[in-house]
Amino acid sequence: REPLAIVQAVSEYLPYLLGLYDCLLRDTILLRDDVHLTWRSMLVSSKFRLHGLLSEVCLMHMLYACSLRAEAATIVEALGAYELGAHDRKACDDRLRVAIDLLCRASGVCEYVATQLLPTYPAPPSKSAYPPELVSEGVQACSKLAMADAHALAIRKLLVPYARHHGPPLPPQHPSPSLLAKLQLHTASLFLEAHTLGAQSLGMEPHSAKHKLAQKLHSLLPATDLGGKMAFLPY
């Protein structure tokens, strides 16, 4: 399905799910049996048998966040090369702002799962017992990766007006090189943190060979029903 359709469906479903979960916490509703569900991870090609309504609450938030990232990637892909002339570029600016906003929202949703929901979730006997979407390091990696994508896209958008300028001196309105360096370093640090946390969530050594980590991360493609557009954005 299209990512936007999934975003809309989850947006409609989450309020009911959260209302039911709140009623369970307040004991205004009692379940005769525990909730059981089978989940196919969006990050690894495995199925997991889970129980408890909190599992579904966490996973629906993660599905929402991943779909937001997928929709952002779809928008960027549809724009193609947007280092264009001033007239043509204006038509792309609004779409780029939407994509950046979606990435920031995805990062915030993942951060909410990591800081507000997972601390109350039962600790796994091993990291392989739960999908990466229910492991704190994996969720934090998704949050930082989405934020890094947003930063990288915003930097590219910032530099688009000057893409056709060659040679010194810089145009009068060009962003400060020192500011750009700080932004790039911060973005790179977010990507590095995401890779390290992602490796930890998969039981890998964060300082293992770079090509092994890159190969493993490349294998974490989203489910085919999202069109494979949830991976790194093209910069």
Regions found by a protein language model. Give the residues of each.
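Extended alpha-helical scaffold/coiled-coil
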Residues: 1-235
